[in-house]
């Protein structure tokens, strides 16, 4: 005979496993710092200047960093020039804002990976800072 409490505990445990699996499949955006003033936020079509450090979620090993090159990375947001997790995770960002992006493999390099530094099916973690939006100014609000 089943005990109602045991059944409820089993259901809650199953639900927590399902939710954990779902969150591993979704982009996670952690805001680390937001400036007090934010007159302009990033949007699709903006030319962004970023600093970033990328690591593998499984072991924390660093695979790339603009800081190591002492040179910001520039790209156009939403133009497909970067992985999908960046195009999604860097929207509505303030200049000087810092975020931590945890990007599941299907929004990064997927089944192929990016050999030799990023294995297939890798979840990636990026610490990012928006240094500037090159094509817009405060007066364009």
Curated annotation (Swiss-Prot):
Main location: endoplasmic reticulum
Gene Ontology MF terms: peptidyl-prolyl cis-trans isomerase activity
Subcellular location: Endoplasmic reticulum
GO terms of biological process kind: chaperone-mediated protein folding
Keyword Iron-sulfur set for record: no
Domain PPIase FKBP-type: 45-134
Transmembrane segments: none
Activity regulation info: Inhibited by both FK506 and rapamycin.
Residues in the signal sequence: 1-23
Catalysed transformations (reactions): [protein]-peptidylproline (omega=180) = [protein]-peptidylproline (omega=0)
Matching InterPro entries: FKBP2/11, PPIase_dom_sf, PPIase_FKBP_dom
Pfam families tied to this protein: FKBP_C
One cellular component term from this protein's GO annotations in UniProt: endoplasmic reticulum
Keywords in alphabetical order: Endoplasmic reticulum, Isomerase, Rotamase, Signal
EC number of the protein: 5.2.1.8
Known role: PPIases accelerate the folding of proteins. It catalyzes the cis-trans isomerization of proline imidic peptide bonds in oligopeptides.
Family: Belongs to the FKBP-type PPIase family. FKBP2 subfamily.
Protein name: FK506-binding protein 2
Gene behind the chain: FPR2
């Amino acid at each position: 005979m089943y005990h109602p409490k045991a059944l409820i505990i089993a259901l809650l445990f199953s639900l927590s496993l399902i939710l954990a699996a779902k969150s591993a499949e979704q982009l996670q955006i952690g805001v680390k710092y937001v400036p007090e003033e934010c007159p302009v936020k990033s949007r699709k079509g903006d030319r962004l200047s970023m600093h970033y450090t990328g690591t593998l979620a499984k072991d924390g090993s660093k695979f790339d960093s603009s800081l190591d090159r002492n040179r910001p990375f520039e790209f156009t947001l939403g133009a497909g020039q970067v992985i999908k997790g960046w195009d999604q995770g860097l929207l509505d960002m303030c200049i000087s804002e810092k975020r931590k992006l945890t990007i599941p493999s299907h929004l990064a390099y997927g089944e192929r990976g990016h050999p030799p530094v990023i294995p297939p099916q890798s979840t990636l973690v990026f610490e990012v800072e928006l240094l500037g939006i090159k094509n817009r100014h405060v007066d364009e609000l």
